[in-house]
Amino acid sequence: MKDNLASSAFDTNFTHQAVDGRTKIVLFGASKAGDYTLRAYLAKGYDILAFSDNNKALHYTKKEGIPILPPDELSRIKFDQIVICSQYWSEIYQQLTGELNVSKDKVIVANSSELKATTFEAPEVMAQARLALRWMLNMFNHSARPYYLDGGTLLGLARSGDLIPWDNDVDLSILQQDADFYSEFLETSLPDLEQYTSCRWTISYLLYEHSGLVWQKGQLRKIVLTNEDFNFSVALIVRYYNAPFYCYSAVSCIFSDHERHFSQNDWLDFYGVKAAVPCHYQSFLDATYGDWRTEVRDWHYTDYKNTDFYKGGKDD
């Protein structure tokens, strides 16, 4: 009886008329990231057949008029590609290519820019991001506590001296022993940041939902400052020590970088303000990105060189 009900629900919901000549796409992930990926793929001219998601509460509902189907119904659709638009891409990839027997050449992961809402390509957002980073650098440089530019922020400064236009957040790292200091420091300094940028900001603390390599459930994963007026964030990632590496977890990955990069720091200039970066930052970038000097707009999480992928506890 259950199978008949599911079949009836599928027949009722899946009424899409394919558009000849267009690549037929299923988007796996019906969260906010799915919204952004939908816009990106519609703009590219793709024919979006359906969403799919593991959240049963969403099954046979619709997003933007597009049906959200259970994963086990995908075999009933003739699609060209499934695009994973979720931070849990590693688990979903294994689910699709293993449990659901989807051909690997039909499964792709949305690149980082497709998963984002606002980017720094908007001049007013770029101006605010630069202003916020300058404030951070000035304040942190006087704190006598270590910090390091990280991720796309470090990559942009090392390559061109500026933020990457298609990025949408500012990334820094701190060490686990300094997490309490920076949490309190930012909490008390938030009014100053709002005055400096003439914007509203909120602060949030993301905790590990599962114990992992060297962190325990409930320990701080990152501090996130969100600009409520221009919809971008500044993230302080907490790195935990697992000799001889400093590590953190995100998007189904464990990122590990050698302790030599954090024993001290180098400096880069950001619009006249000194910015602390990992020691030997060029080799740090080599280990993270490979050929980091060449711009790659369509960057996927699978492209990182300093990660191990895991299946299990889901921490963004």
Where are these regions (language model features)?
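Hydrophobic, well-ordered beta-alpha structural blocks that scaffold small-molecule cofactor pockets
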Residues: 1-78, 83-118
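Helical scaffold of the NTase/Pol beta-like nucleotidyltransferase catalytic core
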Residues: 18-19, 103, 107-149
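Short, solvent-exposed loop/turn segments at secondary-structure junctions
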Residues: 30-34, 56-57, 87-90, 153-156, ...
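Active-site nucleotide-donor binding segment shared across nucleotidyl transfer reactions
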Residues: 39-40, 137-170
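Metal-dependent nucleotidyltransferase catalytic core
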Residues: 125-132, 173-215
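Catalytic metal-binding acidic patch
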Residues: 161-182, 272
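Catalytic cores of NTP-dependent nucleotidyl/adenyl transfer enzymes across multiple folds
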Residues: 227-316
